Regions:
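Cys-dependent protein tyrosine phosphatase-like superfamily
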Residues: 14-138, 153-201
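Positively charged n-region of N-terminal signal peptides that target proteins for export
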Residues: 1-4
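Bacterial N-terminal signal peptides
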Residues: 6-15
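A phosphate-binding catalytic loop at a beta-strand-loop-alpha-helix junction
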Residues: 138-151
């Protein structure tokens, strides 16, 4: 089996739900927060890709093939955090058009941590709305899952009431690093107000 074929098989196993899987989208998400499950997705995503529970996927930039596979496996909402400049410069296809042509909902929340595309509480609110309103599985992505991990961590703290240590550990298992400044901006509040991460200064 070629490496690409093996990666495709591994990709599909992400959707094999076991008894411990938890539904995290919708109006009544599971109370227990599952740990992210990561797999090698060579040829499908630019970088990291993980499943959290039964129905949330967080990763880097998906390929056209990845989006088609996701749609076939029940993903109905795609949330993109990349800026227009990033998409124009480095993505060879129109992601929004492809997502919509496949019958999925496209939610655009460009974030870069600058004046034009800041990390803001509004981004957390918009993502939370997407989590509540989707009628299927959801993909959250940026370039390498770094911004996506930070938004996920902020969402867990603000919208799900997950303790800061647990929220950051969950996001860190995807691709979170140097978490304090962007998450504080997303929450518009310093982390010590919510609790301080372990071993932090």
């Amino acid at each position: 089996m070629t490496r690409l074929a093996a990666a495709a098989v591994a990709f599909l196993t992400l959707f094999a739900v076991d008894a411990a899987a938890q539904k995290l989208t919708g109006l009544k998400p599971a109370a227990v927060l599952p740990a992210p499950v990561a797999l090698d997705t060579t040829g499908m995503f630019l970088a990291k890709f993980a499943r959290v529970g039964d129905d949330v996927f967080i990763g880097g930039q998906p390929t056209e093939r990845a989006l088609r596979e996701l749609q076939a496996q029940g993903v109905t909402t795609v949330v993109n955090l990349r800026t227009p400049e990033e998409m124009t410069r480095s993505v060879s296809f129109d992601e929004a058009a492809l997502v919509r042509s496949l019958g999925m909902t496209y939610v655009y929340i460009p974030m870069r941590g600058n004046a034009e595309y800041p990390y803001s509480p509004a981004a957390v609110t918009k993502f939370a709305e997407a989590m509540r309103s989707t009628n299927g599985k959801l993909l959250l992505h940026c370039t390498v899952a770094w911004r996506a991990s930070h938004l996920w961590g902020a969402y867990l703290i603000k919208e799900r009431g997950i303790p800061i240590d647990s929220a950051l550990a969950n996001a860190r298992a995807i691709n979170l690093s140097d978490e304090r400044p962007p998450i504080e901006q997303l929450l518009d509040q310093s982390l010590p107000t919510f609790g301080r991460p372990p071993h932090s200064p």
